[in-house]
Structure formats: C-alpha cells, structure tokens
C-alpha cells in the first residue's frame, strides 16, 4: 500500500480504552523509510505557556494511534447485536411497567433506555461505532464522518435487529402490550409530536457528535454522556411521544404490534433533528490549530 492511500476497509471507529497496533500487519521493517505512514502514530505538538525564569515556551506532544481495520461483516454483526440489545431493553421497560401496574415508573423507563445505550456503546463502539440508529448513521454520513457506501447496510441491519428484538419481546411478553409502541398521546397534535421528536433528536445528535467526533471532547465518557442524553430526552418526551429519537425504536415494535399510527413522524422527525444537531455542533466546534479536516470515518472513539 502506498503512503497516503486509502485502505480497502475503513478504519474502525474509535472508542475509549483499546489501543491499536503501532505497525501494519506485515510488521516493522529495519530501514527508516519503509514504515507505512498510515500505521504510524500521529503526533501533534501543542504550545504551553512559557515557564517563569526559563524565558521559553514549552510544548507537549499528543499521540494519536490509528485504530485497526475491521471488516464490514464484523461491523454489521456488532451493529445487529447492539441494536437488538437496545431495542429489546428500551421496549421491555414500558411493557413491564404497563403489565405490572407501574412497577418501573417513567424514570425507570428512561433509565433503562439510557443504560442500554451506554452499555452497547462501551461494548461494541470499538467494532462498529455503535450507531444503533439510522438517523445517526445518515447524519454522520452527511457530515463526512461515515462512508455513504456503508449506510444502506447499516440501516438494513439496524431495521432487521429492531424487528427481531420486537418479536422476541412478543414471545416473552405474550400478548405484546401496547406500552412498547411509541405513538403520540391523544392530547398531542401531529405538529407537536413532530416538533418534540425533532428537538430531542437534535439534542441527542449534538451530544453524540461532540463526544464521537471532536478530539477535544472526553471520548472515554462517550457512553455515559450519550446514555444521559437519552435518559433526559425520554423523561421529557416519554409521556407525549414515547421519546423515540430513533426510527428503528419505533419500527420494530410497530411491526410486532401491527400499530403503524403516525409512523411517518418517527421516521422523518428524528432524521431531520439528527442532521440539524450534528450540523450545529460542527458549526460551533473549535477549529484545530493546525487546520486539520475531520477524518472520513469517525464514531465513538478510543
């Protein structure tokens, strides 16, 4: 592979805690010009304030180690498992709450979804990026943080995992209760439901874009930050729209229950909100001092 060329498979999205190999699979070579630049750590020297008495400014070096390549098949497998876990537990909580007379409470519903998101990000983020959400995948592709060629496969796997999780719930909690389906409350107009889903999706993607694509954000806390955003959104929007923020959170349970009421809201509003939230963060984020552009493929970083 020539220096500067693009590898056949995109680099795995970065996630807290897992270092990558320093050299390519062929191993290091002896001569100093033979190392592949893609496999070498990237160093950036940042100026620090001058030390009193020394009269010179000091510098510190930040080393970025590239993540190893992950095949698309492995990414899709991890994305399927992660989305399945999210939909199963985020949908199970309101079903249990309905079946057992409020045993979990609205806060429990929100916390269950937030914990599921945090768990999946920390366990699969280093493999697939833990998108779990077609709106997120589309927004990242639109902002050049994810390759468009992989979007159809990711969205298809997310939708399939959602349907599988919903039918698994239907088998566990037979008959499938309406509590797991996200539909607008009878007291909420169509416009209000649409705007609510737009706003909470905006909030979610603003946070996700910050912790997943900005090198100055604390990537090690990505799962906690995103899980907290999901919990907050469901606490606010749960009573009115169910707090979906995710087309496949609504799609799978709708198919299992045969309830497609106002489904278009949950397909369109989260996607538009995600695009807006990610775009706004990109507009307000601090620019790199060396003028570097965003990497082609980023998600929850190591």
UniProtKB/Swiss-Prot annotation:
Biological process per Gene Ontology, one example term: cellular response to boron-containing substance levels
SS bonds (residue pairs): none
GO CC field: lateral plasma membrane
Residue numbers covered by motif NPA 1: 133-135
Transmembrane as UniProt keyword: yes
Membrane topology summary: Multi-pass membrane protein
Compartments where found: Membrane
Signal peptide: none
Motif (NPA 2): 246-248
Protein name: Aquaporin NIP3-1
Taxonomic source organism: Zea mays
Lineage of source species: Eukaryota, Viridiplantae, Streptophyta, Embryophyta, Tracheophyta
């Amino acid at each position: 592979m020539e220096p500067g060329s693009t590898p056949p498979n995109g680099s795995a999205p970065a996630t807290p805690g897992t270092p990558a190999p320093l050299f390519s699979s062929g191993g290091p070579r002896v001569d100093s010009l033979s190392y592949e630049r893609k496999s070498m750590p990237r160093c950036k020297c940042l100026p620090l304030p001058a030390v009193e008495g020394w009269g010179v400014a000091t510098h510190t070096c930040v080393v970025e180690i590239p993540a190893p390549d992950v095949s698309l098949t492995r990414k899709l497998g991890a994305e399927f498992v992660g989305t399945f876990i999210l939909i199963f537990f985020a949908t199970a909580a309101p079903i249990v709450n309905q079946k057992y007379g409020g045993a979990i409470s609205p806060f429990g519903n929100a916390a269950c979804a937030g914990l599921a998101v945090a768990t999946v990000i920390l366990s699969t983020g280093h493999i697939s990026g833990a998108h779990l959400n077609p709106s997120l995948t589309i927004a990242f592709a639109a902002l050049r943080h994810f390759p468009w060629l992989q979007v159809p496969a990711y969205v298809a796997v997310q939708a399939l995992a959602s349907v599988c999780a919903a039918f698994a719930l239907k088998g566990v909690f037979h008959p499938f209760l309406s509590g797991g389906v996200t539909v607008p409350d009878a007291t909420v107009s169509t416009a209000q439901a649409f705007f609510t889903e737009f706003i909470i999706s905006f909030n979610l993607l603003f946070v996700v874009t910050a912790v997943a694509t900005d090198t100055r954000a604390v990537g090690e806390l990505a799962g906690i930050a995103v899980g907290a955003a999901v919990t907050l959104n469901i606490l606010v929007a749960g009573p009115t729209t169910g707090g979906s923020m995710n087309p496949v959170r609504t799609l799978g349970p709708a198919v299992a229950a045969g309830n497609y009421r106002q489904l278009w809201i949950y397909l369109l509003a989260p996607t538009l909100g995600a695009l807006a939230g990610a775009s706004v963060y990109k507009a307000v984020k601090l620019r790199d001092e060396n003028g570097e552009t965003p990497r082609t493929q980023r998600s929850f970083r190591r």
